[in-house]
C-alpha cells in the first residue's frame, strides 16, 4: 500500500488538478455559463440531513443491488464521460478494468477515446453504452450494432443535448478533444479550427440533431434488443412521458451541469421524478456525488443506483487505473459506514425516513 494515499474524492481532485493540463481539468470540472448548477449539484447534497436509527444489529452490511437483473456489489455505477486519454494513456480501458475489479457497471461514452471493441476486450464485465442520435441516423445505428455485438447490456440515450451548452471554460481554452476511434470512417468533421471557440462546439453543431423528439425513441427501439435508459430527465412531465415510451429506466441528469445553467440540481429533482415514475421503471441519478453519504441520500430519495463520473476521472488522472479503482472503493467504504451508522443492513432498508430535505424542514415550520 502506498504512503499518503488520498482519503477522499476532494484530495483526488486536488491531485488531478496538478496532474492535468488546464484545458483537460477545466473540461472535466467545468459547467455551463455562470456554473450555478455546477455548484448546486454538490451543494444541494449538503442541505439534506441524515436521520440515523440506532440499536440495530449492523454486524453484516450488504450493499449489493440489482439493475436489469444484474447484481452489482454496490449501487455505484461509473457514468459516461468522454476523453479518458486526457487523464491517462490507457484511457477508458484502464477505467473499465478499475470498474470491473470493483464489480461496478461502467457506462462507455460515445466519445470514448478508446474504441468500443478495445474496451470490451480489456476485461470481462457488465457494461452499458451511452449514445446520441446524430443527424445521420446511420452513424447512431452503426454504434448501436457495434456495442451490441461487443456484449454491452443496455443503451443510455442522452436526451438533454439538442445543441451544446455554453461551456465558457472550453471556449476560452479552445478545447481540443482526443479523437474518438469509434467515429473513424463514420463521419468526417472539420473541427480542427478552434479560432472562434472549442472543438467540441464545432463537432456538436455539425453532428447533433436538434430535431430529436419522442418519436425517435421508437426508432431506436426498432434497431436494438438492448434495454434503453433515457439520460437527462429532470421533470415529472418528462419522466411520465418516458414511461409511456416504454423505456427500461430513466436517469435524472443535468449533464454534469454542462448544458443548461440554472437547471435544478439533480438530487433536488430526483424525488419529483421518482414519484412520477411510481415504480414503473428504475430511476438512476448522476451529478454531484462526492461522498458515500451522497449515495445514501440518493437511495433514500428513491434512486436505484447513482452514477459518478468526475470522481473516477480524478482518480484516473492522479494514479491511473489504481486511482480510479481506489475512488470507487472509497465511495463504497463511505457508503458502508453511512449505512451502518444509520441502522441499515441492506440498501433495501434505506428509506425516505432516513433523510430530511430542505422541503421537509420548511413544511415542518408551517
Swiss-Prot record:
It comes from the Eukaryota. Keywords: Fatty acid metabolism, Flavoprotein, FMN, Lipid metabolism, Oxidoreductase, Peroxisome. InterPro entries: Aldolase_TIM, Alpha-hydoxy_acid_DH_FMN, FMN-dep_DH, FMN_HAD, FMN_hydac_DH_AS. It holds the Pfam family FMN_dh. The keyword Zinc does not apply. Its cofactor is FMN. The active site is at residue 255. GO terms for biological process: fatty acid metabolic process; photorespiration; regulation of photosynthesis; response to other organism; symbiont entry into host cell. Residues 1-360 form the FMN hydroxy acid dehydrogenase domain. GO terms for molecular function: (S)-2-hydroxy-acid oxidase activity; FMN binding. CDD domains: alpha_hydroxyacid_oxid_FMN. Its main location: other. A 2-oxocarboxylate binds at residues 27, 132, 167, 258. A motif (Microbody targeting signal) lies at residues 364-366. PROSITE patterns: FMN_HYDROXY_ACID_DH_1, FMN_HYDROXY_ACID_DH_2. Its EC number is 1.1.3.15. FMN binds at residues 80-82, 109, 130-132, 158, 231, 253, 286-290, 309-310. It is found in: Peroxisome. SMART domains: IMPDH (SM01240). One of its GO terms (cellular component) is peroxisome. Oxidase that catalyzes the oxidation of a broad range of 2-hydroxyacids to the corresponding 2-oxoacids, with a reduction of O2 to H2O2. May be involved in a general medium- and long-chain fatty acid catabolic pathway such as alpha-oxidation. Homotetramer. PANTHER family: PEROXISOMAL (S)-2-HYDROXYACID OXIDASE GLO3, S -2-HYDROXY-ACID OXIDASE-RELATED. Belongs to the FMN-dependent alpha-hydroxy acid dehydrogenase family. This is Peroxisomal (S)-2-hydroxy-acid oxidase GLO4. The gene is GLO4.
Amino acid at each position: 500500500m502506498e504512503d499518503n494515499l488520498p482519503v477522499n474524492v476532494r484530495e483526488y481532485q486536488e491531485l488531478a488538478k496538478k496532474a492535468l493540463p488546464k484545458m483537460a481539468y477545466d473540461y472535466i470540472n467545468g459547467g455551463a455559463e455562470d456554473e450555478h448548477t455546477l455548484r448546486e449539484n454538490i451543494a444541494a447534497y449538503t442541505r439534506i440531513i441524515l436521520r440515523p436509527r440506532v440499536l440495530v444489529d449492523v454486524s453484516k452490511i450488504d450493499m449489493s443491488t440489482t439493475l436489469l437483473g444484474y447484481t452489482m456489489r454496490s449501487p455505484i455505477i461509473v457514468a459516461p464521460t468522454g476523453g479518458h486519454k486526457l487523464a491517462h494513456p490507457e484511457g477508458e480501458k484502464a477505467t473499465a478494468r478499475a470498474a470491473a475489479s470493483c464489480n461496478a457497471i461502467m457506462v462507455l461514452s460515445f466519445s470514448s477515446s478508446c474504441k468500443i471493441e478495445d474496451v470490451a476486450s480489456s476485461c470481462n464485465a457488465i457494461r452499458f453504452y451511452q449514445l446520441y442520435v446524430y443527424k445521420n441516423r446511420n452513424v447512431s445505428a452503426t454504434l448501436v450494432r457495434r456495442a451490441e455485438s461487443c456484449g454491452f447490456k443496455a443503451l443510455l440515450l442522452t436526451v438533454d443535448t439538442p445543441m451544446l451548452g455554453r461551456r465558457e471554460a472550453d471556449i476560452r481554452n479552445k478545447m481540443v478533444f482526443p479523437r474518438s476511434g469509434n467515429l473513424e470512417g463514420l463521419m468526417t468533421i472539420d473541427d480542427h479550427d478552434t479560432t472562434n471557440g472549442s472543438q467540441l462546439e464545432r463537432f456538436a453543431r455539425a453532428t447533433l440533431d436538434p430535431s430529436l423528439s419522442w418519436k425517435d425513441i421508437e426508432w431506436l427501439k426498432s434497431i436494438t434488443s438492448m434495454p434503453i435508459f433515457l439520460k437527462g430527465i429532470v421533470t415529472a412531465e418528462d419522466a411520465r412521458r418516458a414511461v409511456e415510451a416504454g423505456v427500461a429506466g430513466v436517469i435524472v441528469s443535468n449533464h454534469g451541469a454542462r448544458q443548461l445553467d440554472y437547471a435544478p440540481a439533480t438530487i433536488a429533482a430526483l424525488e419529483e421524478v421518482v414519484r412520477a415514475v411510481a415504480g414503473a421503471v428504475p430511476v438512476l441519478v448522476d451529478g454531484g456525488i462526492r461522498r458515500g453519504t451522497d449515495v445514501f441520500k440518493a437511495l433514500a430519495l428513491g434512486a436505484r443506483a447513482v452514477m459518478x463520473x468526475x470522481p473516477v476521472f480524478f482518480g484516473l488522472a492522479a494514479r491511473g487505473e489504481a486511482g480510479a479503482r481506489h475512488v470507487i472503493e472509497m465511495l463504497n467504504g463511505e457508503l458502508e459506514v453511512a449505512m451502518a451508522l444509520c441502522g441499515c443492513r441492506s440498501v433495501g432498508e434505506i428509506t425516505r425516513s432516513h433523510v430530511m430535505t430542505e422541503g421537509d424542514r420548511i413544511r415542518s415550520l408551517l
